[in-house]
């Protein structure tokens, strides 16, 4: 191309006097890149960098403390906000709003204040200091954003706690002013939340990328053109009225699937089919206002297991048509997965600061009186702030009559109108709200209503519905709005059995006796009074067990400083229980120190004439009863887990004591060697002492049998002692092994101790000496070391009836009557009934002990008396206790619970028993308002007396925990408020939502979809609940039942199309696919119905994914998402096999089922029935044709097992399976262009000739070579 330098010189340069920001810079470089190539673009970028840094250096731009200027209007904004909050607080005290509505109003008020301050910051900097470094950096897009600037010079605002809940106390300070201690602590929540979120999301994002790569790794560009006529019609991606991605942004690098006609002259084409869309072509489309364009797409590409060049379009790296062999599946997976971490980076960069964008306010630009149109269709609702409002069912125009003229304002369907008919509205007043999203996600949430004061419950206008669940639990639910009043008073709850000494309406003074309670003994016994750390303990000794014939000693050298119990017959027991420790049934008190049952090695245990019973504490422990013997057949067992190569002896060898049988393993006794191995690993080495005798016949009937002295084992072998005979085989010869038996006698141990039992209830407790063993009859003890076969223990037993009895072990000194001195210490078990009294008692509760030390007490004898005194002066009102019917309770209405309001009797119409609320107009004078809420007790000529009360508003569906007339204390739970909470953006958007879409999960809160084309009719009842019916022209009718507080998106009488959402919530893609498939199945063949329904669902999934990424300002090209969605929507589920070889429940591709059914129909046989299925990326990866790829992803064992059983063949079409096998991957863009075939043939011929010459002639004969050549 020849450039005329004269023309360039003579061209007049443009001069633009405007600020160039980040977006403009991006646009400049993009235009230069596309028009002049990469070299010029790099040069321009370098020049811009030089200019930028040069002028930044000259200007000396840097942030200093002085640059952080706080708008002077901040204090005024905070003042207005505090006034609003005071109004909210008054509304709550008047019970006009619930605690939830108060919380939401408070949150929204602070959020609005924060937004107003943000606008003020922009205005302030723009007007007063446009060259401020902070302002320039943030608004040019160089560094920082508006949220961060707001925190620097505005206010941090509301913060989210670690659970995502909003902390109602906002941070009013900014970083310039500095935070106080409370604000700093609240601030730290958000900072930590940001760090935790980022780290968790990074891991989630990595796993999402792995799944995406796995599902799309075999998508490669394998051909130039699939010759399809199909395509997808593209338009703007919108959410309600808001355009998320404009059409022209989606077109670059795509190929047209159809001719684009000129709207004015249809016979003229703007662009023809299969044209690559460039920037110039987009300008033409904009010029002609083209709103819909049909494009080639990976979703409609007919290439098998790949995508063609034309359907994919241009590569995003260079703007040219994608190369053959490009692994576009991997690129798509990385393009979607990588921004995953950025989806929640917003939380990190704004430090967890909360922002809400659930509704968009509509403000008036003028003041006047609003007038409703006469034909207005609406229904009443209660807003989230507790205000009465209406929702407009059909769009209408409202008149606003100003002093000068009449203005009109049009409000759309679904708008919430906040002002009443004929009411005066101010300029910039919020008169209505519209939802920013058509499908807000709500979730059920609850909040406890807790009383702020003590008093008596009074229900006003509450209708309760009682429900009993399957477990018999009663639940009380309010059916409408109502009030729970707490009438103030001092509440007294008395324990069970307390007797009131006052009557109803008694006037009492402070310190008067109200009730008394007696604590009586439940058993007979001797009293004992002990002084503990901060209480008196009154013990009634019920019974004792003392060991008479044993004394206690302490030996610090032996038994870890434990006490020894020495009996008169020289037996030593070590005490296991602790002094003063509370004992339970079957606890071990002491254990005999004895080695009479100790073995040298392990072996086999056999019991003779002994009964075994499991102990209730431990299943592996047995109690031995009776007199008998334990026969123990010794054998040494080494349990090792090592390779068989370490063995130094063989199984069947006879080894002597201390022989090394394996490396580092020595035997303790002589005997026959038995080695147990598994997979050439030694598990056990067993040495069995005894004598081996060869025998001729099979003596398996004699094996594992005990023979006594004098018994004949076999011919010529008679035993003279107890032996154990075992049948064995040595080198295929039959033998018997006669093994020695050790005999242990088990005798009666009951006579070891002499127990002395005292007390009237002595049968409650007892001590017994018991023989215990850890081995059952016939058990093989696998051990090298010796074990104790029997443990003789002293056990404590108690009766089940002794539940309220405390039993402890005590050491008591025995008094020698002859010398009157204590010489010996005895062990005693004492059972007591214990009652405690604190030293430091409450002022109004006095307890006194009625018994003396050592006094004999009979059953039901009073031991403690407690007196309950009044803390206040006042009138007594006795009530029944709802929670514990046998307990008495009362309330005293003291002078502090009453207030007097001076007002003339003639000026009001109040009656005794009426309830008034704070702020109520009491008389004819409208300026005179009640300063208190309460119940009218008395009316005089000049004043009224009220009992102070607190009202609480409850909403329908509230779970009520209290009863009318019940007495409650401060902090008691009154009710559980149930409400619908809108999920915050962090929860419904971001990575979890992307994962939900790509894994094709059913959303929790789904919307209702139109089942067919028709008209929607919405019916409302008195409570504002809606019922929807859909009616078609074919007289079809479908009724939808809505969830509580589910919003309807369409107005009554509106025409809706099939699959259109008619209520709020997320779309269930599986339901949408089913609806469209059933509809198209009535219109066309199953294969066409499948393709058509897939096309609908694909567009919806594309829109949903783009909405999530765009909400976080992340741009992803449509074609990447289309590649992944193609993999998710390529299978059908077999329902009936027909005459095919397929099975019901099997997943096959659309291409496969189309070919199979075509072949079956051709031979007049029954085709298979199927339906389209939407697979999540994980399921799609596991159902791929390549079992090697699927097995390397998840469920390896199952996939490989199924592949082996079914005899599957992997054709190694994808990248992953080839990498695993170690083959060359079927991808890469280095393919040779085969356009000039003649030149390629000539080069190949010359190369072949040269190679032939080099191999044939190796002699240094240049002449000959030259001649030949």
Swiss-Prot record:
Entry annotated with the keyword Transmembrane helix: no
Residue sites binding Zn(2+) per the record: 226, 301, 308, 311
Cofactor(s) needed: Zn(2+)
Enzymatic class: transferase
Keyword Transferase part of the UniProt annotation: yes
Localization per Swiss-Prot or TrEMBL: Plastid, Chloroplast
Catalytic activity: RNA(n) + a ribonucleoside 5'-triphosphate = RNA(n+1) + diphosphate
Disulfide-bond pairs as recorded: none
GO molecular function, one term: DNA binding
One GO cellular component term noted in the UniProt record for this chain: DNA-directed RNA polymerase complex
Coiled-coil segments on the chain, per record: none
InterPro entries: DNA-dir_RpoC2_beta_pp, DNA-dir_RpoC_beta_prime, RNA_pol_Rpb1_3, RNA_pol_Rpb1_3_sf, RNA_pol_Rpb1_4, RNA_pol_Rpb1_5, Rpb1_funnel_sf
Function: DNA-dependent RNA polymerase catalyzes the transcription of DNA into RNA using the four ribonucleoside triphosphates as substrates.
Protein name: DNA-directed RNA polymerase subunit beta''
Species: Cyanidium caldarium (Red alga)
């Amino acid at each position: 191309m020849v450039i005329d330098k004269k023309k360039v010189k003579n061209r007049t340069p443009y001069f633009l006097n405007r600020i160039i920001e980040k977006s403009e810079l991006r646009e400049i470089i993009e235009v230069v890149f596309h028009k002049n190539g990469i070299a010029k673009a790099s040069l321009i970028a370098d020049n811009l960098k030089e200019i930028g840094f040069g002028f930044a250096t000259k200007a000396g731009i840097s942030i200093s403390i002085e640059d952080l200027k706080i708008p002077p209007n901040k204090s005024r904004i905070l003042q207005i906000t505090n006034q609003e909050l005071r109004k909210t607080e008054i509304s709550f005290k008047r019970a006009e709003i619930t605690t939830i509505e108060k919380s939401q109003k408070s949150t929204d008020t602070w959020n609005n204040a924060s937004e107003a301050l943000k606008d003020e910051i922009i205005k302030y900097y723009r007007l007063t200091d446009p060259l401020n470094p902070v302002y320039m950096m943030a608004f040019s897009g160089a560094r920082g954003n508006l949220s961060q600037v707001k925190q620097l010079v505005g206010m941090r605002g509301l913060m989210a706690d670690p659970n995502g809940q909003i902390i109602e106390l906002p941070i009013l300070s900014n970083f310039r002013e500095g935070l106080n201690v409370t604000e700093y602590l609240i601030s730290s929540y958000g900072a930590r939340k940001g760090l935790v979120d980022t780290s968790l999301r990074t891991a989630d994002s990595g796993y999402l990328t792995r799944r995406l790569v796995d599902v799309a790794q075999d998508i490669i560009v394998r051909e130039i053109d699939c010759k399809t006529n199909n395509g997808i019609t593209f338009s703007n991606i919108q959410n309600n009225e808001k355009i998320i991605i404009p059409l022209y942004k989606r077109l670059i690098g795509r190929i047209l699937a159809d001719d684009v006609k000129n709207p004015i002259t249809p016979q003229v084409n703007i662009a023809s089919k299969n044209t690559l869309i460039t920037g110039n072509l987009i300008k033409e489309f904009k010029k002609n206002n083209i709103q819909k364009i049909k494009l080639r797409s990976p979703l409609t590409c007919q290439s098998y297991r790949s995508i063609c060049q034309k359907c994919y379009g241009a590569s995003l790296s260079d703007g040219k048509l994608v190369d053959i062999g490009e692994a576009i599946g991997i690129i798509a997976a990385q393009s979607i997965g990588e921004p995953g971490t950025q989806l929640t980076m917003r939380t990190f960069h704004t430090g967890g600061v909360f922002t809400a964008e659930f509704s968009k306010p509509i403000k008036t630009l003028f003041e006047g009186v609003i007038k409703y149109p006469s034909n207005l269709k609406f229904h009443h609702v209660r807003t989230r702030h507790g205000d009465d409002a209406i929702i407009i069912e059909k769009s209408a125009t409202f008149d606003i009559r100003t002093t000068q003229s009449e203005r009109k304002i049009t409000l759309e369907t679904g708008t919430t109108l906040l002002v009443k008919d004929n009411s005066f509205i101010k300029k910039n007043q919020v008169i209505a709200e519209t939802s920013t999203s058509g499908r807000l996600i709500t979730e059920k949430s609850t909040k406890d209503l807790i009383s702020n004061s003590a008093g008596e419950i009074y229900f006003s206008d509450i209708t309760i519905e009682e429900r009993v669940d399957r477990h018999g639990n009663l639940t009380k639910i309010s059916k409408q709005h109502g009030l729970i009043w707490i009438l103030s008073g001092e509440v007294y709850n008395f324990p069970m059995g307390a007797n009131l000494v006052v009557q109803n309406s008694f006037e009492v003074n402070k310190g008067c006796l109200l009730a008394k309670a007696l604590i009586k003994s439940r058993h007979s016994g001797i009293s004992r009074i002990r002084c503990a750390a901060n209480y008196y303990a009154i013990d009634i000794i019920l019974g004792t067990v003392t060991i008479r014939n044993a004394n206690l000693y302490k030996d610090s050298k032996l038994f870890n400083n434990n006490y020894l119990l020495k009996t008169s017959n020289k037996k030593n027991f070590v005490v296991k229980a602790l002094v003063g420790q509370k004992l339970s049934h079957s606890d071990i008190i002491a254990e005999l120190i004895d080695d009479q049952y100790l073995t040298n090695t392990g072996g086999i245990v056999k019991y003779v004439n002994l009964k075994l019973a499991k102990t209730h504490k431990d299943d592996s422990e047995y109690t031995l009863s009776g007199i008998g013997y334990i026969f123990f057949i010794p054998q040494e067992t080494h349990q090792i887990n090592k390779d068989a190569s370490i063995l130094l002896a063989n199984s069947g060898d006879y080894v002597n004591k201390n022989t090394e049988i394996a490396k580092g393993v020595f035997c303790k006794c002589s005997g026959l060697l038995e080695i147990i191995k598994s997979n050439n690993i030694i598990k056990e080495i067993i040495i069995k002492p005894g004598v081996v005798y060869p025998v001729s016949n099979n003596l398996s009937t004699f094996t594992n049998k005990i023979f006594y002295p004098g018994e004949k084992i076999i011919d010529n072998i008679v035993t003279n002692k107890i032996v154990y005979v075992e049948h064995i085989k040595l080198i295929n010869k039959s033998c018997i092994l006669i093994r020695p038996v050790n005999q242990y006698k088990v005798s009666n141990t009951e006579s070891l101790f002499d127990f002395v039992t005292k007390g009237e209830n002595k049968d409650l407790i007892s001590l017994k000496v018991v023989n215990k063993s850890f081995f059952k009859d016939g058990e093989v003890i696998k051990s090298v070391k010796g074990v104790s076969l029997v443990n003789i223990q002293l056990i404590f037993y108690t009766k089940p009836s002794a539940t309220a009895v405390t039993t402890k072990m005590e050491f008591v000194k025995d008094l020698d009557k002859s010398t009157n001195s204590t010489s010996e210490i005895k062990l005693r078990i004492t059972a007591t009934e214990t009652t405690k009294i604190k030293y430091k008692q409450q002022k109004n509760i006095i307890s006194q002990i009625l018994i003396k030390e050592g006094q004999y007490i009979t059953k039901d004898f009073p031991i403690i008396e407690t007196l309950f005194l009044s803390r206040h002066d006042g009138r007594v009102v006795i009530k029944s206790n709802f929670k514990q019917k046998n307990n008495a309770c009362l309330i005293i209405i003291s002078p502090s619970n009453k207030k007097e309001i001076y007002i003339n009797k003639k000026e009001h119409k109040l009656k005794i028993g009426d309830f008034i609320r704070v702020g109520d107009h009491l008389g004819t004078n409208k300026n005179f308002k009640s300063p208190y809420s309460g119940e009218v007790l008395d009316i005089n000529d000049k004043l009224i007396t009220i009992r102070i009360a607190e009202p609480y508003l409850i909403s329908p569906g509230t779970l009520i925990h209290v009863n009318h007339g019940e007495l409650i204390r401060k902090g008691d739970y009154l009710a559980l408020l149930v409400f619908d909470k809108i999920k915050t953006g962090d929860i419904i958007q971001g990575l979890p939502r992307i994962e939900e879409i790509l894994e094709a999960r059913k959303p929790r809160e789904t919307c209702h979809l139109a089942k067919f084309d028709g008209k929607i009719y919405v019916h409302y009842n008195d409570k504002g609940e809606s019922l929807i019916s859909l009616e078609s022209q074919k007289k079809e009718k479908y009724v939808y039942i809505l969830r509580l507080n589910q919003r309807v998106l369409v107005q009554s009488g509106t025409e809706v199309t099939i699959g259109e959402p008619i209520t709020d919530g997320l779309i269930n893609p599986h339901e949408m696919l089913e609806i469209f498939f059933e509809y198209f199945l009535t219109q066309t063949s199953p294969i066409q119905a499948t393709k058509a329904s897939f096309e609908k669902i694909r567009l919806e999934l594309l829109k949903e994914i783009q909405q999530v990424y765009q909400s976080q300002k992340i741009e992803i090209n449509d074609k990447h998402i289309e590649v992944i969605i193609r993999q998710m929507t390529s299978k059908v589920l077999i329902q009936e096999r027909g005459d095919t070889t397929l099975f019901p429940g099997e997943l096959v591709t659309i291409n496969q089922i189309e070919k199979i059914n075509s072949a079956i129909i051709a031979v007049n046989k029954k085709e298979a029935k199927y339906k389209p299925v939407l697979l999540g990326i994980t399921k799609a990866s596991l159902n791929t044709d390549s079992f090697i790829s699927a097995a390397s992803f998840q469920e390896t064992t199952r996939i490989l097992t199924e592949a082996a059983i079914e005899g599957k063949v992997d054709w190694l079409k994808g990248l992953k399976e080839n990498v695993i096998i170690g083959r060359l991957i079927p991808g890469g863009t280095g393919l040779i262009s085969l356009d000039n075939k003649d030149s390629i043939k000539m080069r190949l011929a010359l190369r072949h000739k040269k190679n032939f010459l080099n191999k044939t002639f190796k002699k240094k004969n240049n002449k000959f070579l030259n001649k030949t050549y």
